[in-house]
């Protein structure tokens, strides 16, 4: 999809969207303030005909980043003349309300906490280049994320569309997905967009 270059995307889906597609479901992205990840994720979804008419509800704790990402996604939708709707709120529960698909791509603690996931193991002789998913750094990251993931699950159970699917992209992906599956009481799948 053509983003913000002001050109119509060759092969845009807009011309192929007929009355058979209705804006009948909502996709919520929690942690949508990451411009690179959210833009790529939603751009990919907009290549699927069933998603070009849905509502994308973006939520993040950082209102500045959230607004930037919303503008980028709205530009993608507009340039490609798609009927998708884009909303943004810092109220996570409002964003989840009525959603069929809820995606988590949060980094609890931000980059500051991430640096401690590397520094603490290194202090004890464990040199790991990334602390996202494995080793001591991954465990530290999981301890920060799992309580938040379970809060998301509570909201999903209470206000999302019945039978909604929670798609976890947040690292440590396996730990977060396991916690949501074992203790969250929601339908959940763990995914890695970068593989």
Predicted features along the sequence, with ranges:
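N-terminal Rossmann-like dinucleotide-binding module
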Residues: 27-52, 56
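Rossmann-like NAD(P)-binding element
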Residues: 59-65, 79-163
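NAD(P)-binding Rossmann-fold cofactor-contacting core
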Residues: 50-74
